[in-house]
Structure formats: C-alpha cells, structure tokens
C-alpha cells in the first residue's frame, strides 16, 4: 500500500480518472490506460517502476491461483499511439510463443497426490485432502452457493441429469477494436476511445448475462420441481468472456 502523498502519482481507477493525466503531468509515475479482453495496458514513467509492479503482480497471481502465470510485454512509448499499440501486441505474441511453461512444483515419489491435478496434497479438510490449487479454488467459490453440488442443478437424477458447459467469447471484438482505432494516432484520443469501448463491451455482455439468468429463473418452475437450487452456475463473466 502506497503512502497517501504518493498514491496520487499512481492512477489505477481508469474508468474515472483523467485519460491524459500521465501525458500532462510528469509527476504521475503510472497510469492504467484501460483494461479489456483479459489485458491491462499501463503507462510507466520509469522502467524500474514497471519491473517492480510486474514482480508484485506475478507473485500475487501465483499466491492466489497457484497454477497461473503472468505474461508481460514492454515497449518504449512514442508519440504515435497506433504504432505503439501494434508494437506491444506484436511483442506480447512473441512473449507468449517463447515464454517457458510455468508449472508448480510436482510431487516427489513419496508424496500423496491429487487424483485430478497430480499436484501434492497439502491441505486437509474435515472430509478430504486437497492440493493447493483445489484449496484456493474452493475458497474462491462462495459457500452459500450450493450449485457446486452438480446433483442440485439437474432437473432429474438419472437419464435426464446431463449438464452442459457454455463458453461464450466475443471473437469479433478484436476486429471491432482494430477498425475503431486504426485512424486514431494521438494518445489522448486513443485512450479516451478505448476506455469507452472497453466499458461498452463489458456492460453489454454483463447485461446479456443478467437477462439470460432472469429468463432461466423464470422458466425454472416449468422444468424442475425443486426451485430452491438454480439451473445454472456462473463461473466467469468478465468482459467478452463468459462461462
């Protein structure tokens, strides 16, 4: 946590702050331009600060997921946003293609392992032993939502107990963004436009999810006797990525 006098130089509330603050005020050390499509685009005044933040993020993600890793691309800022945007995305493609696969430490021959992941068992609940990844996933799922028990979600146990997994990804979002941004070259205009576009995409998809859930809840009494349990479990609803 930064001291109050320094926090004003690190701008993270990208939906609310001045999109040109970093460009106009040299005391601003860092500013999030926008977050969208699973990526965060950030301006840093100094390379050392960029390195420190990325180290913190990598450790934070590892501690809270155990099995995910952070991919980071860095390019030098110019005055042409369009060229910089293309350059950093090209660098990210290169990084992802060449970065080593980061995996948690596996089990030694004398260790008990998780039957699903193969990772060492590290935790014990009242009912079972868990690996670190399984423990973190369970902690992330609210205890009040019993849709984690699949039998509670089906309409009937037996022949009609099949569950479906739906994954929706806005595959045309990249083209939409590219078409929108290809004629914008200044950072001020580009950041403002990208922020509005990212918020619009996120709001539209979340609104669609909410409407879908309302519809499913409305028809639940017609297809299931016990309506105390939902017919669905929302796993991910972030931007244009829904599961």
Task: Annotate each language-model stretch with its function.
Residues 1-243:
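Regulatory and interdomain segments flanking nucleotide-handling catalytic cores
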